[in-house]
């Protein structure tokens, strides 16, 4: 660039910073805030599938799946993990179905968790926006998008048609929320439900509620499904669960995590550690015996898990080794939302 252009650019940058504040424009290489901070999901397998060690701060995340697949459990596990590292969390319970006893069992500090049960979708999204703008909240969970009912629909009659009303409400909310969440480095997780499209002969008939806006604005989209039951004798004690990373703007997408959700306990962390440890040669398996660092830790997977549960220092050391081995920061992609890619009103 010649000298005159450099002077003109410097003057323009100075004028922009004077008018809009320092940091309003910068060179990409100078932006230290591009390093994305993440919070663990509570599942090592999912953290590895996400590629960054967890879900990103300052971004919108969508978690969707069929009923009883583990969507709320996943978000409560993340809240518990966030609280353990000193983060402040809020739960906007539009479904009016949050169970504090279950949340406590998963490790959530319910005395510190902010909870709102709004009457309308607009109220829920305004509360979310106000919390984000405060700069004091680190994680907001909205459960669920399908329960964000527009005020006009609540005040209307049962048979009234409200075509596209919820989609327009969400589209407007996304435009407001995205910048506020980024500025305050606050993560917002939307739990969503699945619906079936009518008349689809080929391809996947499933879709999520609330229009297209959330799909565009979300940096990460997770599809969570129950794949089987875990039984002890004849009694079901948990679910085999598969979580697919359908969209990922911070690392490579389309990876998946297979994990277990135990009733009343959440993710089977010790089971994940044993399975991943064996797969990556950190835990030795000879017959039915499992060994770690040359010491036998149990006969059978259940006993190996019990050893790790009773020895948290050994479990933490194994977790750290696996994260160092499987999470490569060089693979991270940091992709900011591009306004021109966002859906316009007619695309809802």
Curated annotation (Swiss-Prot):
ATP binds at residues 65-72. It is found in: Cytoplasm. The keyword Repressor does not apply. One of its GO terms (biological process) is DNA recombination. Its main location: cytoplasm. Pfam families: RecA, RecA_C. GO terms for molecular function: ATP binding; ATP hydrolysis activity; ATP-dependent DNA damage sensor activity; damaged DNA binding; single-stranded DNA binding. InterPro entries: AAA+_ATPase (IPR003593), DNA_recomb/repair_RecA (IPR013765), DNA_recomb/repair_RecA_CS (IPR020584), P-loop_NTPase (IPR027417), RecA-like_C (IPR049261), RecA-like_N (IPR049428), RecA_ATP-bd (IPR020588), RecA_C_sf (IPR023400). It comes from the Bacteria. GO terms for cellular component: cytosol. Keywords: ATP-binding, Cytoplasm, DNA damage, DNA recombination, DNA repair, DNA-binding, Nucleotide-binding, SOS response. Gene3D superfamilies: P-loop containing nucleotide triphosphate hydrolases (3.40.50.300). Belongs to the RecA family. Can catalyze the hydrolysis of ATP in the presence of single-stranded DNA, the ATP-dependent uptake of single-stranded DNA by duplex DNA, and the ATP-dependent hybridization of homologous single-stranded DNAs. It interacts with LexA causing its activation and leading to its autocatalytic cleavage. This is Protein RecA. It comes from Vibrio anguillarum. The lineage of its organism: Bacteria, Pseudomonadati, Pseudomonadota, Gammaproteobacteria, Vibrionales. The gene is recA.
């Amino acid at each position: 660039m010649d000298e005159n252009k450099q002077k003109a650019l410097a003057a323009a940058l100075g004028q922009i910073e004077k008018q809009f504040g320092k940091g309003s424009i910068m060179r990409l290489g100078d932006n230290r805030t591009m390093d994305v901070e993440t919070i663990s999901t509570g599942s090592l397998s999912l953290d590895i599938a996400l590629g960054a060690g967890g879900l990103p701060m300052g971004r919108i995340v969508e978690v969707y799946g069929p009923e009883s697949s583990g969507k709320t459990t996943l978000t409560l596990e993340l809240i518990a993990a966030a609280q353990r590292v000193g983060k402040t969390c809020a739960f906007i319970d539009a479904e009016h179905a949050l169970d504090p006893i279950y949340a406590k069992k998963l490790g959530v500090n319910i005395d510190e968790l902010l909870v709102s049960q709004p009457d309308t979708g607009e109220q829920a999204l305004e509360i979310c926006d106000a919390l984000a703008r405060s700069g004091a909240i680190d994680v907001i969970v909205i459960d669920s998008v399908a329960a964000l009912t527009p005020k006009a629909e609540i005040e209307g009659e049962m048979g009234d048609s409200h075509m596209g009303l919820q989609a327009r409400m969400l589209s407007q909310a996304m435009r407001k929320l995205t910048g506020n969440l980024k500025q305050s480095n606050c993560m917002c997780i939307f739990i969503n439900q699945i619906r079936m499209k009518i008349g689809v002969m080929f391809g996947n008939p499933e879709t999520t509620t609330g229009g297209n806006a959330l799909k565009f604005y979300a940096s990460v989209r997770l599809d969570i499904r129950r794949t089987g039951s875990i039984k002890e004798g004849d009694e079901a004690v948990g679910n085999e669960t598969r979580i697919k990373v359908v969209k990922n703007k911070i690392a490579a997408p389309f990876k998946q995590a297979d994990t277990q959700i135990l009733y009343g306990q959440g993710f089977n962390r010790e089971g994940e550690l044993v399975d991943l440890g064996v797969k990556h040669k950190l835990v030795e398996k000879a017959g039915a015996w499992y060994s770690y660092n040359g010491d036998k830790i149990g006969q059978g997977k259940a006993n190996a898990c019990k050893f790790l549960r009773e020895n948290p220092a050994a479990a933490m050391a194994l977790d750290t080794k696996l994260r160092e081995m499987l999470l490569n920061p060089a693979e991270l992609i940091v992709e900011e939302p591009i306004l021109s890619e966002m859906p316009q009103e007619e695309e809802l």
